[in-house]
Amino acid sequence: MTYYKLKIFLLIFAFSNLLACSANKSYELKGNTFGTIYYIFIEDDKSLNSNEIHSNIKYILNIIDNSASNYKNNSEISVLNKFKPDAFKTISSNLFNIINKAKIVGDMTNGYFDITLGDIKISKGFYLNKKGSKRNGRRNYTYKDIILSDKNLIKKTFPNMNIDLSGIAKGYAVDLIFNYLMSKNISNFVINIGGEIKTFSKNKDFINLAIDDPTNNQQYIEEVSLNNNSIATSGTYIDTVDFEGLEISHITNPKTQQNVSNLNLLVSVIHDECAI
């Protein structure tokens, strides 16, 4: 089987089943978002207005970026992180949904997925646009201390809590784009935002992927086939900084409150929802 390598978080694509339908028309949409790149492959037996589709996709991406980006000082999540009063605050439905899903994933992983680790990452030198001081001692809050209420209301029970959505925002955007493309009755497509991937095939064809070895990007360690579902991949080698002479990963263990220093780890999760 032939695999075509696409340099996005070291994932390898094979569109062998889709491309076999030579009578179909194919479209490639790509660009930059969330500090990474996105790539969308579409195939259909009818002509599509790819410019209109791409424009609507960019609109979706822009909405989520402005809501959930920790890199933008004026994004909705950045404004929320600066909000100190011990009171509820109204947020957009998208931000509410992202945080709600993050809390669900936190419960599913026994607390190992925790969106309140932003202050630790900032103190170690991640997010260069943010200023943070070196932390002393352990902090005593988790994602469970974020309270969500009706009508898109949120309350941080610890005002200095810094919510980091980088582990879920891309997947949430992938799911929104998936729903949009489904509404257009498109036959086959693959969505990839920085390694967060979701596929659809009207004929339920499998789309084959291979995942690179984090220790040697000339080799791959696993082959997977997707059939109308998602895969999200992250690794300790992807985003690192030098902290006090030690190279550390952006991935933080919420139990120890320490960044992972083993830079050869990678995990992929397959699920119906890319945000999960």
Walk through the language-model features, giving the residues of each.
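Mature catalytic core of soluble alpha/beta enzymes
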Residues: 2-9, 19-276
